[in-house]
Amino acid sequence: MPAKGWGSLSQPFAGLIARPYNAECMRSRYQQKGSTMTEHFSQTLKQASEPLWTQAVEHSFVKELCAGTLSDISMVSYLVQDHRFLDSFLTLLGAAMATADTFEARLRFGRFAGMVSGEENTYFLRAFAALNVSEEARANIPDTEPTIGFKAIMRESATTRSYGAILSVLNVAEGLYLDWASRAPSPLPNNFVHAEWITLHDNPSFREFVSFLKSELDRVGPAQPEICRDFFLRAVHLELEFFEVNYRFGK
């Protein structure tokens, strides 16, 4: 796949503004001892991200991917950029293991890192081969603005040493993907490039991991509502931007 034209993807994505936020109000709601609201902290962040979350999981890119009608150009653009997250994403998972406060949580993050390093990375390589995208061609394709942003936010959250901030980014990165993948109609597309990307993000193990991420954020997030909200909303913005830029390139 030739690299010509990929630089046009660097246009910024504008016009997406999160709803207003009162930090003191949020802090008081989630620091009440015994409050059942802490069980729903992750859901509150998701609600605060609307309408961007819904726009992302219902984006035309996702709908066409699930239907198997997404153009190869858009899929190549998307996969090349997404594959570049893996290094930063593994750094983020490493930070999650380092900052988690339980042994069980560290084990879960370790197992997931193994899946990303193995099964998911292998999928990317198989998909690139099927789409005739050489390693040289991939190297000549520049990062888009959303890719730059994603790499930055993953490493930024990792360097905070805040388990809540790290969980906030992970909840978006994995939870939003489960949301759209679980909506895929049956049967799945015949092309494995589409079908396996869906099943990688909608299977029993992945659903269990996302549930774990939510429960961890519900548990520790209320103690740091501002930083969690900041990272969560910025990550949702980037997810929508990422779909939009790669979809637009194929048109």
Regions found by a protein language model. Give the residues of each.
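Intrinsically disordered, low-complexity segments enriched in serine/proline and basic residues
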Residues: P2-A14
